[in-house]
Amino acid sequence: MASMKSLATAILVVLLLAALSREGRSQNCSAAIGELMTCGPYVLPGNNGAPSEQCCSALRAVNHGCLCETINIISSLPDHCSLPAVNCAA
């Protein structure tokens, strides 16, 4: 379970770094993505608990375009690391 928490934290750090390193990205977007670190416990597989109000508030503060672009950046990471694409079909 500790390794899953570490993985979730690493993913959120990557989110933050991706948002911060993107040219032309506003500071508001970077700060909002950084606030999503409070959602770390809720992105682990098997977590059935409700997110905290702090997490929900941070998510509400993120601009839709900023969130989508950050997700797209994360989706491209395997390709940039010479890894196969991840297919998360439901």
Swiss-Prot record:
InterPro entries with a match to the protein in the record: Bifun_inhib/LTP/seed_sf (IPR036312), Bifunc_inhib/LTP/seed_store (IPR016140)
Keywords: Disulfide bond, Secreted, Signal
GO cellular component terms attached to this protein's record: extracellular region
Family from the record: Belongs to the A9/FIL1 family.
Gene giving rise to this polypeptide: LIM1
Chief localisation class: secreted
Keyword Disulfide bond included in the entry's annotation: yes
Signal peptide limits: 1-26
Pfam families tied to this protein: Tryp_alpha_amyl
Protein name as it appears in the record: Protein LIM1
Annotated S-S bridges: C29-C66, C39-C55, C56-C81, C68-C88
Organism: Lilium longiflorum
Subcellular location field: Secreted
